[in-house]
């Protein structure tokens, strides 16, 4: 007798599928934590300090070359006597350093390294522009401008160091800088000056204030420099050009209020006549 067996639970002719193979769970990814030892931290601090010494040494060399050339121009007995040229030459001399500062900032944004030849070109062009100030004004005015601009640069550098050192002091300094410009504007507004004098001084103070903020930012960039940049010579020269141009433009802006008694009275009537001719033609 033939026995016929029926498979319960499955239709006839259907092949039973095998379950997919189950792979074992993969272990979690291993996180590699770079542990910086005390010796490595000390080595990086020393490397950063030496890099900053070289940086500010380069800036001091550029500034010394500019000051020495300006003193030589001041010793020349000849002076610019044409009123218009004497009073406007410092303004035209400011345009070239501002253009060079923009180019140095562009190099900083593009992460392009600076070269020794570029530093020499920057120093030469800027020195020629600044030295013309010595042919336009008295020695006392130039010396006062150098002293005052140097004090402002040292003050901005000190604020940047304090901001990098302590978080609470950083917030206090930011609050101080926020209220400083309105206070200076209020001081200018209450003075018994002519309207054009107030406008020019307010614009000059605004430019100096903005340049102080830029100088603080550049100094903080130097203090918070990442070790991944390897402290190369190209980065050093590029940063030195930025700091040098900040100091030069600060000096040129400080010249404006110091020379106010010379050129404010001369051009007050001319500005008034020009405005009257433009608006009442």
Curated annotation (Swiss-Prot):
Write out the entry's keywords from A to Z. Host membrane, Membrane, Transmembrane, Transmembrane helix
Q: Where is the composition biased (Pro residues)?
A: 20-30
Q: Where does this polypeptide localize?
A: Host membrane
Q: Which GO terms describe its cellular component?
A: host cell membrane; membrane
Q: Is Lyase found in the keyword set?
A: no
| Leader peptide range in chain numbering | none
Taken from the record, one Pfam family name reads Bax1-I
Topology within the bilayer:
Multi-pass membrane protein
Transmembrane spans: 58-78, 88-107, 117-137, 145-165, 171-191, 196-216, 248-268
Give the residue ranges for region: Disordered: 1-30
What InterPro entries does the database record attribute to this sequence? Bax_inhibitor_1-related
Membrane as a keyword? yes
Superkingdom in the source lineage: Viruses
Per the record, the similarity remark reads: Belongs to the cytomegalovirus US12 family.
Q: What is this protein called?
A: Uncharacterized protein US12
Species the sequence originates in: Human cytomegalovirus (strain Merlin)
């Amino acid at each position: 007798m033939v026995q016929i067996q029926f498979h319960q639970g499955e239709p006839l002719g259907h092949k039973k599928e095998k379950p997919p193979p189950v792979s074992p769970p993969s272990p979690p990814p291993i996180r590699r934590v770079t542990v910086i030892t005390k010796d490595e931290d000390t080595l990086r601090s020393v490397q950063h300090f030496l890099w900053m010494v070289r940086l500010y040494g380069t800036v001091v060399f550029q500034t010394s070359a500019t000051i020495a050339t300006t003193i030589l121009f001041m010793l020349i007995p000849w002076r610019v006597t044409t009123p218009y040229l004497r009073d406007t030459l410092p303004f035209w001399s400011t345009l070239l350093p501002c253009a060079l500062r923009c180019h140095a900032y562009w190099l900083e944004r593009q992460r392009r390294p600076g070269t020794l030849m570029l530093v020499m070109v920057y120093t030469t062009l800027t020195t020629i522009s600044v030295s013309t100030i010595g042919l336009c004004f008295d020695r006392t005015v130039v010396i006062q401008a150098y002293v005052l601009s140097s004090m402002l640069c040292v003050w901005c550098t000190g604020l940047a160091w304090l901001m990098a050192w302590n978080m609470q002091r950083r917030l206090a300094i930011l609050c101080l800088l926020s209220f400083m410009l309105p206070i200076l504007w209020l001081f200018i507004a209450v003075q018994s000056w002519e309207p054009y004098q107030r406008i020019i001084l307010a614009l000059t103070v605004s430019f100096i204030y903005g340049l102080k903020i830029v100088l603080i930012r550049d100094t903080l960039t130097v203090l918070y420099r990442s070790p991944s940049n390897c402290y190369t010579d190209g980065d050093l020269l590029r940063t030195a050009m930025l700091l040098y141009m900040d100091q030069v433009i600060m000096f040129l802006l400080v010249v404006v209020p110091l020379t106010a008694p010379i050129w404010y009275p001369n051009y007050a009537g001319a500005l008034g006549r020009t405005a009257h001719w433009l608006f009442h033609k």
